[in-house]
């Protein structure tokens, strides 16, 4: 009887210790001056999670052309990692607490105003984590 009980509940315990993921999305920012960084609103898990970040997928949508020299970083509260392109994956924040919010940070080097301004329509992350 005890063996049957253990056999029934071990699979559920194994699932509870497995990996997970959370998704966050938001509207973007407008950047109209070179040499000034702009940060998105924080993207956080909808409910508390426990684990360490592993693979993060991202996407963002711009209104208009991509300014020459645009740099984009994905940042936790303690670290940033550079990302290339409007979508992709990164392991640059591996081992960061999976409960930490993330932000996109955009910057175009130089000085002066930009025309047209950089408008970020939307941004999204999918954070995979291990427990």
What is the meaning of each model-derived region?
Residues 1-8:
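Sec-dependent signal peptide recognition
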Residues 16-131:
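Disulfide-rich extracellular domains of secreted proteins
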Residues 11-13:
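N-terminal signal peptide c-region/cleavage motif recognized by signal peptidases
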């Amino acid at each position: 009887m005890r063996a049957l009980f253990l056999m029934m509940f071990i699979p559920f315990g194994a699932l509870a210790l497995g990996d997970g993921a959370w998704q966050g999305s938001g509207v973007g920012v407008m950047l109209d001056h070179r040499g000034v960084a702009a940060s998105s609103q924080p993207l956080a898990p909808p409910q508390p999670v426990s684990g360490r970040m592993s693979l993060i997928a991202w996407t963002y949508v711009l209104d208009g052309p991509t300014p020459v020299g645009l740099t984009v970083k994905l940042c936790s509260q303690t670290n940033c990692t550079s990302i290339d392109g409007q979508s992709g994956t990164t392991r640059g924040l591996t081992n960061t607490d999976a409960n930490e919010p993330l932000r996109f940070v955009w910057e175009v080097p130089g000085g002066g105003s930009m025309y047209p301004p950089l408008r970020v329509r939307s941004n999204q992350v999918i954070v995979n984590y291990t427990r």
